[in-house]
């Protein structure tokens, strides 16, 4: 039995289908921290979900079940919390996991893409040999806010010849417009829970 089969068997024994009760359990496991990192912000702390093994397992299983028959050939996770959800999803799907990182963190030849922040710009990088032409790529991250990080990630994948039509998140903040932004780029967004506000 492969590692992916063992993980799948464990998940199936623990959590079977996406129900309103399961999704509420996941949402309830995410703590809200007011006025962090600055006044007026309600910070959604996904690390509290990671501390609860049942909530963490449920979130992974629900993402896996959503994309099990989608023909995904690679899962890409964005630094850093995208790794925590993307890698187990890739393992359960039986496909490779590709990290997208900040500059200077990947050892082989890389491709980079700049993106806008609230007060400037930043860059993301991917190994040039991590995606092959025709790969069907699922992008996974913990949270969707404005969509800038995922847009840059999708551009990197597409520049390498990969196809990105789906992105998956634990949390969506719809008031910040990220889902609409990604939809205009041909990327369908799937999120387990939504929170209003910033």
Swiss-Prot record:
The protein's annotated pathway: Purine metabolism; AMP biosynthesis via salvage pathway; AMP from adenine: step 1/1
PROSITE patterns reported for this sequence: PUR_PYR_PR_TRANSFER
Pfam families: Pribosyltran
Catalytic EC class: transferase
GO biological process per UniProt: adenine salvage; AMP salvage; purine ribonucleoside salvage
Record's subcellular location: Cytoplasm
Swiss-Prot/TrEMBL keywords: Cytoplasm, Glycosyltransferase, Purine salvage, Transferase
Sequence intervals crossing the membrane: none
Keyword Cell membrane listed: no
Catalytic activity: AMP + diphosphate = 5-phospho-alpha-D-ribose 1-diphosphate + adenine
Enzyme Commission code: 2.4.2.7
HAMAP family on file: Aden_phosphoribosyltr (MF_00004)
Job description of the protein: Catalyzes a salvage reaction resulting in the formation of AMP, that is energically less costly than de novo synthesis.
Record family assignment: Belongs to the purine/pyrimidine phosphoribosyltransferase family.
Name of the protein: Adenine phosphoribosyltransferase
Provenance organism: Serratia proteamaculans (strain 568)
């Amino acid at each position: 039995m492969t590692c992916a089969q063992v993980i799948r068997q464990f998940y199936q024994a623990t959590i079977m289908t996406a129900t309103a009760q399961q999704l509420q359990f996941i949402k309830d496991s995410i703590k809200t921290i007011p006025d962090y990192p600055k006044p007026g912000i309600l910070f959604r702390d996904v690390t509290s979900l990671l501390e609860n093994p049942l909530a963490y397992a449920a979130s992974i299983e629900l993402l896996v079940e959503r994309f099990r028959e989608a023909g995904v050939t690679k899962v890409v996770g964005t630094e850093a919390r995208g790794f925590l959800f993307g890698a187990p999803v890739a393992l359960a799907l039986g496909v490779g996991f590709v990290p997208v990182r900040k500059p200077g963190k990947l050892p082989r030849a890389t491709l980079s893409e700049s993106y806008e922040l609230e007060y400037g710009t930043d860059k993301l990088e991917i190994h040039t040999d991590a995606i092959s032409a025709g790969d069907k790529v699922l992008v996974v991250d913990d949270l969707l806010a404005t969509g800038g990080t995922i847009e840059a990630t999708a551009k990197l994948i597409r520049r390498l010849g990969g196809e990105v039509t789906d992105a998956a998140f634990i949390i969506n903040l719809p008031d910040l417009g990220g889902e609409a932004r990604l939809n205009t780029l041909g990327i369908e967004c799937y999120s387990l829970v939504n929170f209003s506000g910033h």
